Amino acid sequence: RSQRAGLQGSEILSDPVRVGARAEIVLCAGAIGSVQIMERSGLGQVERLSGMGIRPRHRLAGVGENLQDHLQLRLIYKVSGVKTLNAQAKHWWGRAAMGLEYLLFRTGPLTMSPSQMGVFTRSSASVDRADLEYHIQPLSLERFGEPLHDFPAFTASVCHLRPSSRGSVHINHPSSLAQPQIDPCYLATDYDRQVAASAIRVTRGIVNQAPLAAYRPQEYLPGPQYESEEALVEAAGKVGTTIFHPVGTLKMGPASDPSAVVDAQLRCHGVRGLRVADASVMPTITS
């Protein structure tokens, strides 16, 4: 049975206002945001919504499921005999000099993208096409939001392009001010753990090549003490973080697929006048 879609929104910190639609509503809030709007509107898993006091309006078991993301493993190497952005950008005077150079000459670090090099390669000879991607940055930090290191270093960020792990996104409170519950389930499958371990080995092999020998690279993170398969998987969990590519939580597929939320025209199954047009509809993550 098809339901007619209606939109209920609210101004920030004010009473809700109801907005109708003469034709269609198109959700474009992303793989995290669109799920929250759907669930708070009563579209999703009936038991989950009922448990939070939300009146279920249409059962869609796939809402919030099938979350996929690229997990980047941030391997950091100390180097010698060369300057990196750690020295240039760590202190205010260095940042001021960078800004002045850009203003006067339109040159210098502020003209660069965050990553100066990208590489595609295979995690092993058994795969028929590249399944790893590198982003190389001439800087390093312990984790996002923290200061740059006080030693020269570069970061080799490597991610598995086609992970098999699947997570979920769901609301945990009816209020639109509440944060969602995001469970990415990184490295949840044997295959993903195997590729992660291989990615660290491949990175070490690249760094140990002759062209980099003059800079005497030393592995800082995760550290050379991680050697066995089990240890490398543990290391991947320590240095891994999102690369901000969440997709799949409102999966596209035929109505015969119980996990599908929208059809090939992005129309929500069973709900007239509602489409979703963002990365949440992607059945699988792209590389």
Each predicted region: which residue ranges?
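N-terminal low-complexity segments that are often proline-rich with Ser/Thr-Pro
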Residues: S2-S14
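Core beta-strand elements of the Rossmann-like FAD/NAD(P) dinucleotide-binding domain
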Residues: L13-E24, C28
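A glycine-rich dinucleotide-binding beta-alpha-beta segment and adjacent secondary-structure elements
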Residues: L132-R143, D150-S157, A210-I285
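Glycine-rich, N-terminal phosphate-binding loop of Rossmann-like dinucleotide-binding domains
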Residues: A29-G30, S41
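Mid-to-C-terminal "cap/lid" subdomains and adjacent gly/pro-rich loops that border
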Residues: A23, V35, Q45-D150, V207-A210, ...
